[in-house]
Every structure is written in structure tokens, then in C-alpha cells.
Amino acid sequence: MGGSADPRFAGVRDAFEALGDPGNALAVPHAGEGVVDLYGGWRDAARTEPWTPGTLVHVFSVGKAVVAAGLVRLLEGRFDDPVAAYWPEFAANGKAETTVRHVLAHTAGLPAFPEQVKDPTDWHGLCAMLAAAEPEFPAGTAVAEHAMTYGHLVGELIRRVDGRMPGEYLRAEYTGFALGETDGEQARTAELEYAHPDWPAQTIGTDDYRRRVLDNPPGWLALDVLNSPTWREAQVPAVNLHTTALALARFYAALPEQEIHARGEDLLLRRHVNWGLGVQVEETGEFGMGGIGGCDAFADPAKGYAYAYVTRSLGGFDRSERLIEALEECL
């Protein structure tokens, strides 16, 4: 195990070491000071290359908060503008009144790609598919995480407003985020593995709605897809940002407190969710995003800390929950 932890947070260090994860990292800034920056294990499945501070990790939906923050920065509060004001083709099939806020808060009515995705690297084709789609529900009338479509909706708005692809825009505006990896970044990216063999099937589930939303492109959770150069260099902003725990923790530490923009029983998550602009917001003020596989990042403004945990071992959130419990005890 490498890195450091302030002596006041020795309990967090002990909890991190006790996880025994094959490759992971944890970062916590508190009251403006970096108090935890730990990493351990191996970057590769063969366990020949040790994890380093620069190891990049595929963080799945944790990246949604980053791409959303990029659009929020660009629009400077113009969230009630129609999406079609920036993306005219989007007005098709009754979407002329759909706003940027609807998109950012997962209420745009496009929670799934309407057709099978044959090429996840086809940015313009997938955006055209969404622009032409008929919404599954009128914008603003239901809450449903746009698990796979979110990045193309938000990312295309970034491209229409700024002129750059979302990956290039995020590189220019933030530090430590790789959306569409270069060869050099791929060389230091963690190799994903399953914590247990049935993880993909359990994640997708058997519910028809969940499968339609999550399993498109079909089979994308296979390790030979997720670890492939083609997937890593693609821009799929909803799910394939690569980054470090430290970059995520610093990102959250710099964000202002977040407001709730939509709330209700989320059709995908099957629980009540308060959505901000790209993040889930608790009634007590904490805000953040987790990703399938166990990566997790959030901020707690009331207690003055931010938190990010990343792992290459795809499993549940029990690891992050144990770390958060240890952190709260130290505070």
C-alpha cells in the first residue's frame, strides 16, 4: 500500500488496507487539506505492475458528474433554454420544449437508446438517433436515470455550444480526467476484472426495462470490451471516463453546494432520488455519484470534506461503505 493519511485518519488507512482489493485508491480532502491519499494493489490482472498515483481507472457513472459540470460551466445558468436552441435537430418528435435542465436532471424522457447500438464509437450517429427519437415520457413528468444516453445528450450540448468534443473540452477545463484516452493514458490504465464471475449478469438483471436501458450496446460489460483500446479511446461520457481518486476528490472539493432540480421514484434505480445537475443530492446536502462496479465520489459540504474511491475490481458498494463509516468515525 502506498500514499499517506493524516494520523487523525488512521482508522481510514486501516479500513482501506483491510479491504484487500486487488487494485484501488482513496482520496479525501477535509477543510481545504488533503488528509487521505491512499492506493494499493496492482494495475494489471496478472499482478505484475504495482498501482501508482498516476494509475487511471474506468469509473462508470461517476463520470456523469464531470461532464455535467462541464456543461454547467459553459451555460452559466441558462438551464431553462430549450435543448433545440443549441441543437436544432433535437426538436423532432415533440422535444421542442425539452430544456437543458431536463437533460441535466435525468427527466428528458430519453433514458435508453431507441435502437440497438451497433458502434459505441459512432458519436454523430448516436447523437442523431437521440435527436430523432420520440421521448418515452413527456420531459419533466418522470425521473429516470439516463444511464447510457446521458453522456451523449450532455456531451453533444457541450459540442454545440463550445465547438469541441466533450473529451477535448474536459481536458482543457479540468485536471486529471481522460475521456477518450491517448496511447500514453492507456499505458497507465488499470485493467478491470470481476470481483465475482456473475457480476455482469447481476448488474444488468432480468427486468426488461433495466436490460433495455443498461445492456445497449449488448455485451458492453464484457472484460474484453471494457479493457480494449477501442473502448478506452472512445468517448462514451455517461460511462467511460478514466481518472484517479485524487482528481475526483479535488473536483468535488471545488464544487459549490448543489440544489435539487428533480425528485421522485427513479424508473431505473427503483428508489426515491433527488437529482441535481448531474449528481444525486441528499436532503441533508451531500451530493455525488456512484458507478456500477463500486467506484464512488461525493462531497459533504456540512462536514467540509470530499471523498473519492476507485477500484478496478468490479463489485458492490460495500467497500466504499466501509471506508465512509471509518471516515465518519474519524471526523
Predicted segments — roles?
Residues E17, A84, A108, A131-P135, ...:
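Amphipathic, well-packed alpha-helical segments that form the structural scaffold of globular domains
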Residues P53, S61-V62, L75-P111, E115, ...:
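Active-site helix/loop module of the DD-peptidase/beta-lactamase fold
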Residues M1-W42, G54-H58, A142, A147, ...:
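Catalytic loop of the DD-peptidase/beta-lactamase superfamily, centered on the K-T-G motif
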